[in-house]
Amino acid sequence: MKIELAKKETVHFIGIGGIGMSGLSLVMKRKGFKVQGSDVSNNKNVERLKKEKIKIFIGHSKKNLKNATIIVISSAIKKNNPELIEAQKKKIPVIKRGKMLASIVSLLKNIVVVGSHGKTTTTSLITSIFQETKLDPTIINGGVINSIKNTAKLGKSDWSILEADESDGSFIHILPTYSIITNIDREHMDFYKSMDDLKNYFLNFIKKTPSFGKSFICIDDKINRELLKKIKFKNFYTYGLRSNSNFKIKNIKQFKSYSKFDIKVSLPNTKIHNIKNIKIPLIGTHNIRNSVGALGVALSVGIPIQKIKNGLKNFQGVQRRFNKIFSYNNIDFYDDYAHHPTEIKVVLEGVKNVYHEYDKVCIFQPHRISRLKDLKKDFTYAFKNADSVILCPIYTAGEKIKLGFSYENFAKEIIKNSKVKLFMVENFPRLVKFLKNNMYGKKIVIGMGAGSISNWMRELPKLM
């Protein structure tokens, strides 16, 4: 599909309110495409798009495709979606989000962030660095970047900063100039046939890096290290805590609202060997790694080190990544997107490092039955750095499959393996009641999950 011809088409996004779909549709609209879409319900992303004069249908119906000539779908769209069925019946071209994204940015110099965890924060950190320069990149992210108050922005330069979604393998269609591979974990196994299949997708993506580009690979990740052994070309740099990293993290100091660290740089033909006193308004070793990946790319692009440090220091954050929502009885309540065992573990680890004298309370809402079934054992060990867990009902995201095991026994396994106190709540009103009766003393509360838990956290201040 040629982009010049596509501007004459009407592009319909099924599930336009999704975080990745909303960003892509916004950029296409601002590029001059005719854009419309549908979603099952209204949300903040839909409201942002409506302000851009994008026509949005609430509810999925074949009638919504009346003027559509191209359909864009994400991995969240099921085969029985009535609009997808109608598009196939009418032989309207159906394109995956990742492939459409690749087409839109095919003529740009792309900085592409991939990996199982940390993509959104890393993409946002790169954006913050670029904002210290006169470069004006196009940005498409998987979360709302606070400094631009949106998930996406159409820039005027030939640079783009992209978060690429690995859930359906379509990230493989994007041609990176520079890329960051944060980590690779067992996830989206409904698409990937095996872990080897997942690894090969990432390996093939890395191999697409042109000779004039660079891949930045976090060497602290075990699977990343496996892939490094299979890469024959040398246009990649590594970053992390390990001694053989090209960008080695040193002298970490973490506080309640920020972290400081140094980097030892080991690169051929460079005048920069040590970068000291880097400050980021984030906690957690995982976020330090994310910022070093962003720094490495920015250096390769040619951004001066002081501007890079300023961009990291001035980072305004991204929504749903350890955001403070409110305080109650002098207890701070945070919201975080963590919904995979690894994400839960690293967030709680970061919190424990700086809030060691506090009781750490995690309100957890599992997201998708399929994920819980696939990673059940890992979930039971994920809460070791918490003191207590409030377990909410599963947010199914429309899945109609059976859990296949007792949810109560799952809760007992969390108590046993993570060594925490655990309380189960049946619904949001019960959660409110529990919190009102039990939140006192020296505590910190983090709501975690990718479903409705974020809305719950924002409703709590009105009800407590």
Task: For the regions a language model picked out, list residue spans one by one.
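Short acidic low-complexity segments
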Residues: K55-N67, R430, L435
